[in-house]
Amino acid sequence: LGDTFRWKGENVSTTEVENILLMHPHIAEAVVYGVEINNTNGRAGMAAITPAESLATLDFGELLRWAKEQMPAYAVPLFLRVKVKMETTGTFKYQKVRLRDEAFDPRKAGDDPIYAWLPGSDTYVQVTEDVLADIHGGKFRY
């Protein structure tokens, strides 16, 4: 059935979230995995996505509203990593472990922009080093 992770006391199926994200007209590929946030229990959802057209076509507020309508709040990815092309292994599997290890740190993501759904916000915002420091420093309550 695929990988799962726990967030907010719930089991989240990465395959289910991936399949839902792939129904969005502006998402061509999606890989979902759990990442750790300091001072929280479990793993928060993160999705590496490839836009169907370009990054400019993604409306992050609309994407978040849509995701919240399609799945329970605990399953909605808190972080997005936007990739031009998804890397695969020699057997055409997505490199989920590497993505999980790089998490939502923009310094580890190369040219891939990373976005976060911050508590109280109604859209995803780009993760800068300042936003990353605020997340790790506990400014936001997840």
Regions found by a protein language model. Give the residues of each.
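Flexible coil/turn and secondary-structure edge motifs
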Residues: 105-108, 132, 139
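Nucleotide phosphate-binding site architecture
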Residues: 81, 100-101
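AMP-binding/adenylate-forming catalytic domain of the ANL superfamily
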Residues: 71-93, 113-137
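A short, polar/charged loop-to-alpha-helix boundary motif
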Residues: 102-115
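AMP-binding/adenylate-forming catalytic core of the ANL superfamily
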Residues: 1-75, 90-94, 98
